[in-house]
Amino acid sequence: MIIVITGTPGVGKTTVSLLLSQRLGLEYLHVSTFVIERKLYRSYDELRSSFEIDDEEVAKELNRYLSERKNVVLETVYPSLVDNADKVVVLRKHPKVLYDELKKRGWNDIKVIENVEAEIIGYVAQEANEWFKETCEIDVTNLSPEEVVNRILGNICDKPVDWLDLPDVQDLLLALDKIIS
C-alpha cells in the first residue's frame, strides 16, 4: 500500500506520516530527504533556504524506488512526483495558524508568505486533485496528530477547503501584502 501525505510546509505532514507509518507498520519516506541523499536537486535557493529539484529526475527515481516497495507512507509537498498511490491525503491548516507555525521555525518573511499564500489558494490540494483520481482532504487546524491519523484510517475526509471565503483570511492576505511591499 502506497499512502501519500501531502500539504504545504507546516501542516503536520511529518508528524502524521510518522505516526501513520508506525500504526500500520509501513516504511516511512520523506521525499525531501530522499532528494537530498540522492543529490536530485539542481541548486540551493539561499533566499528560500530550500533545494530546487529536477522534477523529472526526482519522479523517475522516486517511482523506481516505490516500484520495489509495496508498503510506504510517503510525505511530500509535491504530490505529482508520485505516479501511483493507493491513498492520497492532503492536510490543510488555517492560514493564520500556519503563519504562526512557520514564523516559529524562524523562516524569513518571503518563505513564510509564499507558503501561507500557497495554502490560501490551495496550491498543493489542487495539484493532488489534478494528478490523482481520488484525494482525501483534512483540515488539521484543530486536530491532534492522533485524530488526523484516525481520520485517515477511517477514511473521514473534509469537503475541500476554500480559505478565501473567510474574512479573517482576506485580512491576512492584505497584511501579508504589506509585509512584502
UniProtKB/Swiss-Prot annotation:
**Disulfide topology:** none
Task: Identify the domain of life.
Answer: Archaea
Give the first-level EC class, as a single word. Answer: transferase
Gene Ontology terms for molecular function: adenylate kinase activity; ATP binding; ATP hydrolysis activity
Region: LID; residue ranges are 104-114
InterPro entries tied to this protein: Adenyl_kinase_AK6, P-loop_NTPase
Q: Please provide the record's keywords in A-Z order.
A: ATP-binding, Kinase, Nucleotide-binding, Ribosome biogenesis, rRNA processing, Transferase
Enzyme Commission number: 2.7.4.3
Q: Does the keyword Cell cycle apply?
A: no
Cite a single Pfam family from the UniProt record: AAA_18
Question: A GO biological process this protein is involved in?
Answer: ribosomal small subunit biogenesis
Residue numbers spanned by region NMP: 30-53
Keyword Transferase listed? The answer is yes
User: Catalytic activity, per the record?
Assistant: AMP + ATP = 2 ADP; ATP + H2O = ADP + phosphate + H(+)
Q: What is known about its subunit structure?
A: Interacts with uS11. Not a structural component of 40S pre-ribosomes, but transiently interacts with them by binding to uS11.
Q: Which family does it belong to?
A: Belongs to the adenylate kinase family. AK6 subfamily.
Per the entry, what this protein does is:
Broad-specificity nucleoside monophosphate (NMP) kinase that catalyzes the reversible transfer of the terminal phosphate group between nucleoside triphosphates and monophosphates. Also has ATPase activity. Involved in the late maturation steps of the 30S ribosomal particles, specifically 16S rRNA maturation. While NMP activity is not required for ribosome maturation, ATPase activity is. Associates transiently with small ribosomal subunit protein uS11. ATP hydrolysis breaks the interaction with uS11.
Q: What's the protein called, per UniProt?
A: Putative adenylate kinase
